[in-house]
Amino acid sequence: MLEIYEVIPAQEMQNKQTQLTVELRFDERQKSRHKTQTTCGKDLGWFIERGYVLAHGEGLQSKCGEIITVVAAKESVSEVTAENTHQLMRAAYHLGNRHVPLQVDPTKLAYLHDHVLDDMVRGLGLTVTAAQAPFTPESGAYHGTTGHGGGHSHSHGHSHDHHHDHSH
């Protein structure tokens, strides 16, 4: 099994030659520890920084030096379009208020398919279309990155004792 402890940012992957890919759903890309297989059937497991979300185009570097390209798998998503920007912003506000992972593109929003959310968004006057597409939501304001993922992890799969005396 290929053991992964390092993530290579997508920008750096443009200069790398890789032969292995792994296709992952959003829920898999959020895991700090996960076992799966490459698209050609090679076993791999990663041990990366907790809270890190793998992004489409990033690389996973194995302990033995092999590099695997991360591909965002197609998933059931709801795509939201509107007649104007104001409507789209209102939908983003209401979905964000429900803490829904949200992909924000210039002319549409997308979230993992949920018929209750679809009904809410339609009730706001927007168009919701079911689709099969890669899902790359915003990483959030507190993750230290902008846009759809990014960053760099050098987690090495070890833990530290964080025992603190908290006497008051």
Curated annotation (Swiss-Prot):
Biased composition (Basic residues): 151-161
Annotated spans, Disordered: 137-168
Keyword set includes Chaperone: yes
CDD domains: UreE (cd00571)
GO cellular component: cytoplasm
UniProt-listed SUPFAM superfamilies: Urease metallochaperone UreE, C-terminal domain, Urease metallochaperone UreE, N-terminal domain
Ubl conjugation found in the keyword field: no
Subcellular location, principal: cytoplasm
Keywords: Chaperone, Cytoplasm, Nickel, Nickel insertion
Pfam family, one: UreE_N
One GO term (biological process): urea metabolic process
Family as reported in the entry's similarity comment: Belongs to the UreE family.
Protein purpose: Involved in urease metallocenter assembly. Binds nickel. Probably functions as a nickel donor during metallocenter assembly.
This protein's name: Urease accessory protein UreE
Organism listed in the record: Saccharophagus degradans (strain 2-40 / ATCC 43961 / DSM 17024)
